[in-house]
Amino acid sequence: MPPPQRFRVQSKNYFLTYPRCTIPKEEALSQLQKIHTTTNKKFIKVCEERHDNGEPHLHALIQFEGKFICTNKRLFDLVSTTRSAHFHPNIQGAKSSSDVKEYIDKDGVTIEWGQFQVDGRSARGGQQSANDSYAKALNADSIESALTILKEEQPKDYVLQNHNIRSNLERIFFKVPEPWVPPFPLSSFVNIPVVMQDWVDDYFGRGSAARPERPISIIVEGDSRTGKTMWARALGPHNYLSGHLDFNSLVYSNSVEYNVIDDITPNYLKLKDWKELIGEQKDWQSNCKYGKPVQIKGGIPSIVLCNPGEGSSYKDFLNKEEKPALHNWTIHNAIFVTLTAPLYQSTAQDCQT
């Protein structure tokens, strides 16, 4: 009679099933994390399910850094914290970690730890058709979910075509942003300096056909909480660029009447698109962090908002000796206003910036 076969599993990916297991998924994950193994764990996912008759069971996927040899069939046993009970799993080595992950994701509720490791031998990573993967990506609920699907199912495309994939998904998942609704009506700003009001009347008081080919921009400097941001954003449809420039179609539109440039340092704007934005240039390109260069229609003025002080003030920046050319250009393309008081009177607007 041959000796009984010794238990032995050798794999980078382990698929565990715990029948009739009442241990919560959080506790199961904690216990699996604490099990000592000679190979480091990289990822654990636990799924808590119930059969139609209400009977509970757990599934778990464990990914190791390299192949792990298990000769102890009790190694992955779980212990109840509420009663004297042990739960022993069915232990299998999984060639396709992605297939196991997809299987345990279908039903029940899951919890995970670590970073999922894409397996090049996975049926989802190689044998499954690209059409299936991309169809699933199109049906995802977000760009990030779609990228995750392609990373797991089409890793070659994800690595070699990431730039194009991301750019295409941004266009596919594009949703027109909800129009911004100002919290305060324009009529509540009663302390507008004459030069600012003249600028508003000159630009917004005309129809689009009667406006100049390259209207003048305006640079407004003032302390925080003077109402300059809320005033600028209450004038009409606009692009709001704050902190940095982003011409991604998700946040920038070519169909607005003006730009609001808020808290963007003059040094940063000089390195980017100073003359294009302040000079109302038409039909120019700007690069996005991801994706192809964006074509900007332009031809609209900018309201530049800044605080006084070194590094923030556009006036101080332009008055430096080394910038006479930029100074002369800017004063021909924009007017400067320095606020000495809030643009509003009501204390209800003290939160304005």
Curated annotation (Swiss-Prot):
Divalent metal cations, possibly Mg(2+) or Mn(2+). A motif (RCR-3) lies at residues 103-106. ATP binds at G222, D223, S224, R225, T226, G227, K228, T229. One of its GO terms (biological process) is DNA replication. It is found in: Host nucleus. Its EC number is 2.7.7.-, 3.1.21.-. Residues 8-116 form the CRESS-DNA virus Rep endonuclease domain. A motif (RCR-2) lies at residues 57-59. Pfam families: Gemini_AL1, Gemini_AL1_M. A divalent metal cation binds at E49, H57, H59, D107. Homooligomer. Interacts with the replication enhancer protein (REn). Interacts with host retinoblastoma-related protein 1 (RBR1), and may thereby induce the transcription of host replicative enzymes even if the cell is not dividing anymore. Interacts with host PCNA. Interacts with host SCE1 protein. Belongs to the geminiviridae Rep protein family. This is Replication-associated protein.
